[in-house]
Amino acid sequence: MMLPIKKTILASLAFIIMHWRKIIEISIIPMIFAFPLLLVLPELMAVSKQLFMVQTGVSISVPDNTLLYMLLFLFGYALLSINLARLVMLGTGSVSILSCVFEFGKIAKYTGLTMLIGFAIVFPTALTGLLFVQLIVYFLIVPLTLNFVNVAIGRALNLRWRLTFIVHVNLFLMQVLLPTLFAYLFGIVADALGLSIYVTLLVQVIIFYWSGVNLAFCYRVIVAHNSAQSL
């Protein structure tokens, strides 16, 4: 089995173009939750720069209610991610502007999985101080990201996906390397041109939408192949 990179990428982009109205609809509530954090984002970026520069004698303070804003942002992120996956897997009739807003168990499960995978990726890097370790760990656990789709559509988590090496590599390429590389290159260009942080943020949002839809398409191909193999 091969996970067709070109076809999957093009199918994801075509899906976004065809369903842009529904995508905007399911983005309204999540954007409301994310908006407070976006307002203080420039201040948070300034604080992060001060932390990296380690300026002595300079007091560092974060904006009020930052923790609350982060929690609201995380809720909106999980809500939008779930609805994107449901839109791809179950069709337009499965989502609406209020879809999953009150399904706190599902959102908590999705958030917990996000934090678990994030910790598994960041912790080894924090211990070693080597960035490439993060990529190695992410490569090893990237099949677990397919469980985000399982959570979205109400299926049980699967810890053993049994992917072939080629499929594993292609999934890592589409879900990690390509989005990261594109965001990194655009960040360099944005800094060189002096573009606003909100322009960079807009590109990050576009990458998020594409990655979410692309993950669901990868899931469909992998699950369909595994089901055919089990017959």
Language model features with spans:
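Short alpha-helical linear motifs
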Residues: 34, 49-53, 183-187, 198-199, ...
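Selective recognition of hydrophobic, aromatic-rich stretches within alpha-helical transmembrane segments
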Residues: 60-92, 122-155, 194-226
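Interfacial aromatic "cap" segments that immediately flank transmembrane helices
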Residues: 2-36, 98-121, 139-187, 231
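Short, small/hydrophobic-residue-rich motifs at membrane-helix boundaries and re-entrant hairpins
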Residues: 22-90
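Juxtamembrane "helix-exit" motif on the non-cytosolic side of transmembrane helices
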Residues: 43-51, 122-129, 185-195
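Charge-rich, low-complexity terminal tails
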Residues: 2, 47, 166, 215, ...
